Amino acid sequence: MSYIGLAPGMRREITATKHWFQAMDNFTRVFAIRPGEKVLILADPLLDTRVIDAVIGIANARGAQVRVYMEPSTRVTAMPEAAKPLLESADFVVSTWFCSIIDPFCIAMRQRGQRWVKITYFRNLDLLETPQGRFPVELVGEIIRATARAMPDADFTLQWSDVRGSDFCIGYTREMRNNLLAGNRWRGRMLADEPGCYVHYLPTHGPNLWDRTAHKNDNAAPVAMSGTIYPTWAVGFEKPWSERIGCRFEGDTIVEVTGESDIAKVLRTMLLGGRLIELGCGFNPKAQRHTVYPAGSNNPGALHFGIDLARPDEYIRRVMPDWEEPPVHMDLVTLDSTVESITANARQRLLDGGFLTALRDPAVVVAAAVYGDPIALLETET
């Protein structure tokens, strides 16, 4: 006897074409290349060449010129001198390189108006066929703006907790908050169409609940950050671990890693002395929640703590020799955090047990209704 209580899945031939063009519309609008522009692709040997060809195709259709510069891997930690003249002459940059967001030269180019698309999550053209690839980019932007509204326009504290006992906080001044939210990503601008923009494709990896843009990219600025996070997982580990492993911070630096298992010992060797450089959140409801490779889950409410390590790590070099990030970095993951913004007079919950509360913001629900059923769009992965 068999039971059929749910609708069978749609045959691919019924949905494939419409899904493809839906994703292509996102793709062509995010890559907002203009006639006559100079486009530079910062590539690596493991990038699907069809991705490069897709960008070239858009550029050719719009009368733009493309150059491709390749390094031996994505694990470029500083902009190579040989690439700088090409970068200086470009209007639009597509990059797989790790240094894209933090390198001072790259930051300076964006300050001059250069537009960037980072493709950490678009290394294979077949990703256009995923639910994440066709999810409306404007709706991702609405979710991000709703999250930004939960950050008070005042001095406040972001407080973390979870069932494992995490107790971690970051103190924000109004100036820090305004610095962080000023970028195109926190304004929900998902298209690479405004001067100085930096967008992720597939959308979206981040924006971050904290990074050094809150301090105007001053790496020496003190950070009011303290407490312990008990991550549930990390990139480079097959599955979430069962042990309660704690990472205690003083400022942005990890000063203690607790736990007795082999995993805890690996993390202790790896993480002690490491500095938090970004605390990212996912915002695309169709991103797979339990896919944390290569840099953390992009599902709403999934968090990744990006740690720059004190030294290259042997474990990373052994288990991920071709990782897109260098062995001086690690992304810790939580999938069930509660995060609240707290002022002297109020507190507001951004995440509730790993659920991004912005998904039920009235403005987000209204925006989702334009594209279909808000519950199906915002609270399912398929």
Predicted regions and their residues:
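Internal helix-turn-beta structural module
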Residues: 292-372
